[in-house]
Amino acid sequence: MADKELKFLVVDDFSTMRRIVRNLLKELGFNNVEEAEDGVDALNKLQAGGYGFVISDWNMPNMDGLELLKTIRADGAMSALPVLMVTAEAKKENIIAAAQAGASGYVVKPFTAATLEEKLNKIFEKLGM
């Protein structure tokens, strides 16, 4: 299991969704969670460093989750950062686009705590965390 001190950044323009994800992470033992309301806000925080995992929505103002993902993957300092997309975008082409852009995983809203835990564990296992 991953280090419980792992620092998460939860990115979503909907504050209730950020709170839901934060609370689910807390239930899983991860208390080091910060929030960003869009991709621009997230990038500013990520560039300051210290994050070990990003959970991002797709549809957001200013910079959407897919653009954020592509920017993270193109940045040498952040390119290996795990990014889990959590989004209402359930179409096959969206899932393929996220995978091609380098998403570590993909969860469609609405989802359960068990689904989030399963996806996180798969990513942790794949990355040897």
From Swiss-Prot:
Keyword Phosphoprotein: yes
Residue ranges occupied by any Response regulatory domain in the UniProt entry: 7-124
UniProt PTM comment: Phosphorylated by CheA or acetylated by acetyl-CoA synthetase, depending on which acetate metabolism pathway is available. The major acetylation site seems to be Lys-92. Dephosphorylated (inactivated) by CheZ.
Domain of life: Bacteria
PROSITE patterns noted in UniProt: RESPONSE_REGULATORY
Compartment list: Cytoplasm
Note on how the cofactor is bound: Binds 1 Mg(2+) ion per subunit.
Cofactor: Mg(2+)
Positions carrying N6-acetyllysine: 92, 109
Record's keyword annotation contains Cytoplasm: yes
Protein name according to UniProt: Chemotaxis protein CheY
Organism: Escherichia coli (strain K12)
Gene transcribed to yield this protein: cheY
